Amino acid sequence: MDRRIAKLALEYAQKNIGVVEEGENAGEAVEAYLASCVPSLPAGNPWCVAHVRYRLKQAATALGLTYDKSMPRTGYTPDYVSWAVKNGHWVSSKKVAADKDLVRPGDLCCFYFSVMGRHAHMGIFEKWIDETHFYTIEGNTSPPQDIVGVERDGDGLYRKKRTLANLGENGGFIKLDF
């Protein structure tokens, strides 16, 4: 994927921070995100990945570039992680702990939930704040002041302050510069 797509997708996400649901996993913006998936997902479905997919597709179109045809188009985080591992685009949080330069603005962050036994939430990496904290833009999450932890079924699109530990034991990043 052309790096410009990842960077513009991040810019679009930043401009839409604060978009909230109208109902549960519904509303005009949320339904547009869900419709961007293949197959299209109806209102009521989790939309964190759908938001990422929507922004990448939107950015590719705006730049007149092709969205990588091998990349998943679903709304399911494990599909993206499997694809990234298979194609050499996966970077574990353990590797990133040793080298912060492995992840760049616009890359995708994938959260692993041990209680579910899978990756179950995705956002867009924004930037490092310091040695241990970074910002993400995440859909279908709780507001930043909610410090309960990682919320994968919240009400909006927010900037979140995270640590690598927040990604879970098998969490990591999908590099989008290929």
Locations of regions flagged by a protein language model:
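Solvent-exposed, flexible loop/coil residues
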Residues: 34-38, 84-87, 154
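N-terminal capping segments
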Residues: 1-69
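Residue-level marker of intrinsically disordered, low-complexity segments enriched
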Residues: 3, 15-18, 28, 36, ...
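...with weaker cross-activation on analogous glycine-rich loops/strands in unrelated enzymes
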Residues: 10, 62-144
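Active-site signature of cysteine proteases
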Residues: 128-178
